[in-house]
């Protein structure tokens, strides 16, 4: 589905940086939400940026959109990720470092093109990012009722206490995948051996964007200061979700999400022989995270095809020790 605009022939796609909206309901500038994100160590290694794009987005052409996003000069100027040494850099800089062993002359050519004061600020003469690896993230939930069961008597042992359905039930602390698991909520979210809670949420529910946001805030970063109550996690997850996702009511008054969400993990570079592995002939990949394959690594592109806005929310897990 594409947005209902008449300039579908506009090409190529360009991105324009948008300012942050007013604090309310923007979770990433709201004082209360930010204080919790900082407490949970989800701000230091995170970035959020908003852009408007010129060419209509079509769900059947997400490959091109995601690639264009990471290859845009404007995006690379305003949105950075962490490299292998945990330094903030543009995707293009990281790709150029990775490709420096292949063709230094082409790298210099690209650098000259970027330095050209007459060049289009949205485009490059030679694409650096040829492809991006991503997955579509289901996003259909329009209420927080999904988490009501965390307060029910159904799960045993309970997630929250009897008589105080907001207070999390504590347990003997255990280390699982680098996380300190000291309550039944965190055990439910990450312990694969927790048979008591494995059916509390279906795999479909766990795949929903709202559930992923809730899990991210509940697990936090490497220096997370955990909560003893459930409501802060719910409140911040709701605020973040509303900041990234938009819903519209149909003719029957039923709300439906119009935002498409994509989770990116790495980008590929190289045309012809440049940037290809000499053995396999495949394009080389560069991770968007310093330590790949951690569940708290995420780079979500939230696309609103009606407004032609894309918001990127990025976080990289960086161990403290």
Locate the predicted segments by residue.
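Generic alpha-helix signal with a bias toward terminal, lower-confidence helices
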Residues: 226, 273, 313-315
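Extended, low-hydrophobicity segments enriched in charged/polar residues
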Residues: 2-258
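Functional cores of ribonucleases/endoribonucleases
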Residues: 238-295
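Compact beta-sheet-dominated globular domain cores
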Residues: 279-321
């Amino acid at each position: 589905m594409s947005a209902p605009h008449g300039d579908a022939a506009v090409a190529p796609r360009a991105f324009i940086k948008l300012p942050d909206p007013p604090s309310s309901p923007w979770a990433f500038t709201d004082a209360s939400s930010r204080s919790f994100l900082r407490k949970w160590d989800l701000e230091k290694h995170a970035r959020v940026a908003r852009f408007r794009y010129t060419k209509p987005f079509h769900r059947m052409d997400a490959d091109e959109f995601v690639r264009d996003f990471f290859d845009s000069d404007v995006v690379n100027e305003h949105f950075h990720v962490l490299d292998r040494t945990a330094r903030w850099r543009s995707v293009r800089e990281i790709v150029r470092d990775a490709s420096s062993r292949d063709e230094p002359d082409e790298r210099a050519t690209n650098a000259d093109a970027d330095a050209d004061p007459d060049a289009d600020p949205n485009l490059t003469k030679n694409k650096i990012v040829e492809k991006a690896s991503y997955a579509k993230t289901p996003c259909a939930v329009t209420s927080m009722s999904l988490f009501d069961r965390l307060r029910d008597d159904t799960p045993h042992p309970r997630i929250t206490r009897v008589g105080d359905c907001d207070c999390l039930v504590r347990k003997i602390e255990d280390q699982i995948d680098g996380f300190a698991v000291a309550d039944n909520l965190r055990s439910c979210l990450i312990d694969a051996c927790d048979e008591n809670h494995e059916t509390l949420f279906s795999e479909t529910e766990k795949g929903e964007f709202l559930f992923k946001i809730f899990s991210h805030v509940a697990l936090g970063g490497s220096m997370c200061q955990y909560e003893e109550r459930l409501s802060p996690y719910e409140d911040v997850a709701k605020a973040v979700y509303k900041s990234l996702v938009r819903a519209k009511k149909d003719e029957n008054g039923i709300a439906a999400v119009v935002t498409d969400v994509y989770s990116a993990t790495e980008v590929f570079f190289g045309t012809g022989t440049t940037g290809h592995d000499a053995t396999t002939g495949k394009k080389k990949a560069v991770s968007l995270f310093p330590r790949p394959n951690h569940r708290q690594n995420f780079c979500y592109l939230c696309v609103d095809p009606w407004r032609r806005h894309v918001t990127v929310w990025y976080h990289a897990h960086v161990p403290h020790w």
